[in-house]
Amino acid sequence: MNVRANRVSEQMKKELGDILNRKIKDPRLGFVTVTGVDVTGDLQEAKVFISILGTDKEKENTLLALAKAHGFIRSEIGRRIRLRKVPEMSFEIDNSIAYGNRIDELLRDLNNDQ
């Protein structure tokens, strides 16, 4: 990724966090945290990695709410960030936090056994 793509990625992450927490009023939207945004070098596509707190059903409902609000989110990003073309976004669940917690739990269990 080039320098401009990195800058756009960080700005999108910040703005998406604000939009998801303050602007979208969908009750299906659970507790969502934007953990990262990967923007392609040509700024045409962006993968938005999110962490969702809750059950699998709540995660599924949150993804449905995000899919429904996709157009609104994209237009808000367009208003907040000056770009010629707003990247097409896809939302993916980031399981790295749960994975990290599991590793931490296993390490604690090992220390308690010793």
Swiss-Prot record:
Record-linked InterPro entries: KH_dom-like_a/b, RbfA, RbfA_dom_sf, Ribosome-bd_factorA_CS
One MF annotation (Gene Ontology) recorded for this entry: ribosomal small subunit binding
Keyword Cytoplasm: yes
Keywords: Cytoplasm, Ribosome biogenesis
Keyword Nucleus (UniProt): no
GO terms under biological process: maturation of SSU-rRNA; ribosome biogenesis
Pfam families the UniProt entry points to: RBFA
GO-annotated cellular components: cytosol
Compartmental location: Cytoplasm
The protein's role, per its UniProt record: One of several proteins that assist in the late maturation steps of the functional core of the 30S ribosomal subunit. Associates with free 30S ribosomal subunits (but not with 30S subunits that are part of 70S ribosomes or polysomes). Required for efficient processing of 16S rRNA. May interact with the 5'-terminal helix region of 16S rRNA.
Family per record: Belongs to the RbfA family.
Subunit structure: Monomer. Binds 30S ribosomal subunits, but not 50S ribosomal subunits or 70S ribosomes.
HAMAP family noted in UniProt: RbfA (MF_00003)
Official protein name in the record: Ribosome-binding factor A
Organism, scientific name: Listeria monocytogenes serovar 1/2a (strain ATCC BAA-679 / EGD-e)
Organism classification: Bacteria, Bacillati, Bacillota, Bacilli, Bacillales
